[in-house]
């Protein structure tokens, strides 16, 4: 097995995978381990019995008996005992926050009293429980108090010096640690068992609020003298109530020390829950705390896993065997309770408004566009298909809350959770008229993860077109964290090499997808979104290695911030303000989601263009939104074959947006573009141009403003590999497209 080391007995092989060493003692070593059947992490205390004398062996088995007896939320749980000829394995609950001594040492002046009160109350609660069972710990110290951060608890551990006692009868064994031991133990006298734990509690409280032990001198002799004289100094910053409680516990005479009942009722400890543990806090102290349904479910899992039959499981639980059967049962039970507790916390934290917004974002409204439509996007009416969903995708989308992309009437957005049918078919409002053949379209390149190949049912729409680019398989599992199942289902068995080998892909396997929304719908949704804000983002920044280092946002109060981003970005409908990728503010433009340096090119949004290689070589790109953009340019016609262009489009990010350029009005000011609209950081050979069909816009401009114009295009050097462009919005339409001829913005 993975963690099995030479020298360990075969009884533990196959049950636990032993990992790194957590700590060492004189006779024992504590290792991190994983329970094979449940996968839960545990601590395994491995004790070498060959090194133990008779007295130490007696203490060892006394520890086991006491730990079996005490089962409390504030005491580290013993799951299993494996006894072999040479070693004894104690399978214990694993703490995740270190011990209290290290925690105190990080606070030179001690903890604030509210926090100290919280932890001390839990320790008192655990010791009170032990004393009621007539078990004395006798080695209470901060090193034996372990933090469990996920549970918000502290727990007692190391019952190596613990013992059973009878009320009224005194013990004689001298044990414990000098700095925390009561005077009567150090003298070797007979002592009252509960009183020695009270003394140790006083030392622990002193350390919590003061940051150092009360009796800690240069050597053991001086320390012993201070303990016998009961001399210590409480700093003045400690409150009177806390000082009084410490004094009541650190009494030289055991008969004058406070009892546990007096400590629990002390005024300083009032107002704090002595045990924040609830039913769902682990460890589970008894199988009787589970419901009948949970109990039967766990037994059924164990039977199916060939752990034991039902009768053997029930018998082991009723007799407290502390064997592998009971360990497996309680580890499974605690995992179920932990998941149930986390689910309840999430349910309480989710407000109805958040849930409603999440469902609004979740319904997919995307269609496939065959390859032949990409060459004539503006002249050919686009078809809107009904896209049947697989049950896995339908459930995953609803749960994971990805933002929908148009095609739905704003008045019906709140009804999206009820549209749980296998197909989605949305008809535009009757008032919406199909646009003329010369209508303007806005293109945006995005990644998507769906492979829908269903037939299309044409519906004439005034449209907004969004080209979507599939991410590569290498980015598949990191591009959207919230849909791991779908990431695994998609393209099973494919590799990046297969992409490069596919020279001619059929239209339905095209990576470029389209999404349609009517401008009226988008306009209405823009105002709706602007008034109500937006949900949280689920954007993943792990798509490329360089992604997180080069991210930028636009935080302008006016205008429209352009961004390209992954499918998992929490984006609103095109034209809505502040719904870009990442986690931008509701009133700001969308954040810019950069690709890695080798991913930028000029595919033009539709196969064309092969420029933008990692070396920065410029290529050509055809116009993507103008009325005459149906035919490729000679440069793109002479480029690589269609299959190669498709592969290139998977690797290169194209920036293509519909905008307007009329008269003497520039979208990017030639004078200020390098310092305002385009953010600069590092040098590059990339250039950006904004061009428009028709007459040259430079006719009415003075030479100073047109010095950067070449071939009817404004060319600007860019100093980073991803750009942010701020576009002014048309107030009348609320869209980027206006009534003037459309133009393109290319990275060339």
Curated annotation (Swiss-Prot):
Q: Where are the compositionally biased (Basic and acidic residues) regions? A: 549-558
Q: Kindly list the cofactors needed.
A: Mg(2+)
The answer to whether UniProt assigns keyword Nucleotidyltransferase to this entry is no
Highest rank taxon of the organism = Eukaryota
Task: Recall the taxonomic lineage recorded for the source organism.
Answer: Eukaryota, Metazoa, Chordata, Craniata, Vertebrata
Annotated binding of ATP, by residue: 22-30, 45
Sorted UniProt keywords = ATP-binding, Kinase, Magnesium, Metal-binding, Methylation, Nucleotide-binding, Nucleus, Phosphoprotein, Serine/threonine-protein kinase, Transferase
Descriptive protein name = SNF-related serine/threonine-protein kinase
Q: Acidic residues bias: where?
A: 491-503
- Species name for this entry? Mus musculus (Mouse)
UBA domain boundaries: 291-334
Provide the family line: Belongs to the protein kinase superfamily. CAMK Ser/Thr protein kinase family.
Q: Which reaction does it catalyse?
A: L-seryl-[protein] + ATP = O-phospho-L-seryl-[protein] + ADP + H(+); L-threonyl-[protein] + ATP = O-phospho-L-threonyl-[protein] + ADP + H(+)
């Amino acid at each position: 097995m993975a963690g099995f080391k030479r020298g360990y007995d075969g009884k533990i092989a196959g049950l636990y995978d032993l990992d790194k060493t957590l700590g060492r003692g004189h006779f024992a070593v504590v290792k991190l381990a994983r329970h094979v059947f449940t996968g839960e992490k545990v601590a395994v205390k491995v004790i070498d019995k060959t090194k133990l004398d008779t007295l130490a062996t007696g203490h060892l088995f006394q520890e086991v008996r006491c730990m079996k007896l005490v089962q409390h939320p504030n005491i580290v749980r013993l799951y299993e005992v494996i006894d072999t000829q040479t070693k004894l394995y104690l399978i214990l609950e694993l703490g995740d926050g270190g011990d209290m001594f290290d925690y105190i040492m990080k606070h030179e002046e001690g903890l604030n009293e509210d926090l100290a009160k919280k932890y001390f109350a839990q320790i008192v609660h655990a010791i009170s429980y032990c004393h009621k069972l007539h078990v004395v710990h006798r080695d209470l110290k901060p090193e034996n108090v372990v933090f469990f951060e996920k549970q918000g608890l502290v727990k007692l551990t190391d019952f190596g010096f613990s013992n059973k006692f009878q009320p009224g009868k005194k013990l004689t064994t001298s044990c414990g640690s000098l700095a925390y031991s009561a005077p009567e133990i150090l003298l070797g006298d007979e002592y009252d068992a509960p009183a020695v734990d009270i003394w140790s509690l006083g030392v622990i409280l002193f350390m919590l609020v003061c940051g150092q032990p009360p009796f800690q001198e240069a050597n053991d002799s001086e320390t012993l003298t201070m303990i016998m004289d009961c001399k210590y100094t409480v700093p003045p910053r400690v409150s009177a109530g806390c000082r009084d409680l410490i004094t009541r516990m650190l009494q030289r005479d055991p008969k004058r020390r406070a009892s546990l009942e007096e400590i629990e009722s002390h005024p300083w400890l009032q107002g704090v829950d002595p045990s924040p543990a609830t039913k769902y806090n682990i460890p589970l102290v008894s199988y009787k705390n589970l419901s009948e349904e949970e109990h039967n479910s766990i037994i059924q899992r164990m039977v199916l896993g060939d752990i034991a039959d039902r009768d053997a499981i029930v018998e082991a639980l009723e007799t407290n065997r502390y064997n592998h059967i009971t360990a497996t049962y309680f580890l499974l039970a605690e995992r179920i309770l932990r998941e149930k507790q986390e689910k309840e916390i999430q349910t309480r934290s989710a407000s109805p408004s958040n849930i409603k917004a999440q469902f609004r974002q979740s319904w997919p409204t995307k269609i496939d566009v065959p390859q032949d439509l990409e060459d004539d996007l503006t002249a050919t009416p686009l078809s809107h298909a009904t896209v049947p969903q697989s049950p896995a995708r339908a459930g995953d989308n609803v749960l994971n809350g990805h933002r929908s992309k148009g095609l739905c009437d704003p008045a019906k957005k709140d009804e999206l959770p009820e549209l749980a049918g296998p197909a989605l078919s949305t008809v535009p409002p009757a008032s919406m008229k199909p646009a003329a053949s010369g209508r303007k379209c806005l293109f945006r390149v995005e990644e998507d993860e769906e492979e829908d190949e269903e037939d299309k049912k044409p519906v004439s729409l005034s449209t907004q077109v969004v080209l979507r680019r599939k991410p590569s398989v290498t980015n598949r599992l990191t591009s959207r964290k919230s849909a791991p199942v779908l990431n695994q289902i998609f393209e099973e068995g494919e590799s990046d090499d297969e992409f490069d080998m596919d020279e001619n892909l059929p239209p339905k396997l095209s990576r470029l997808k389209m999404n349609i929304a009517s401008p009226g719908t988008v306009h209405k949704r823009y105002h709706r979104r602007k008034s109500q804000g937006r949900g949280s983002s689920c954007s993943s920044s792990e798509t490329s290695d360089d992604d997180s280092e080069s991210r930028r946002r636009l935080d302008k109060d006016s205008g429209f911030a352009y961004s390209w981003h992954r499918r998992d970005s929490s984006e609103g409908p095109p034209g809505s303000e502040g719904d870009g990728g990442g986690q931008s503010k509701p009133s700001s433009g969308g954040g810019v989601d950069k690709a890695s340096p080798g991913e930028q090119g000029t595919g033009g949004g539709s196969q064309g263009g092969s420029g933008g290689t990692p070396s920065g070589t410029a290529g050509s790109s055809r116009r993507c939104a103008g009325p005459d953009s149906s035919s490729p340019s000679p440069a793109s016609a002479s480029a690589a074959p269609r299959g190669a262009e498709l592969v290139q489009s998977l690797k290169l990010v194209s920036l293509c947006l519909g905008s307007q350029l009329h008269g003497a009005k520039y979208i990017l000011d030639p004078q200020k573009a390098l310092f305002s609209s385009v953010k600069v950081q590092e040098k590059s050979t990339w250039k950006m141009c904004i061009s428009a069909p028709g007459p040259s816009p430079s006719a009415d401009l003075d030479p100073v403003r047109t010095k950067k114009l070449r071939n009817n295009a404004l060319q600007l050097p860019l100093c980073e590999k991803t750009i942010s462009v701020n576009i002014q919005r048309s107030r009348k339409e609320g869209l980027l497209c206006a009534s003037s001829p459309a133009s393109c913005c290319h990275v060339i």
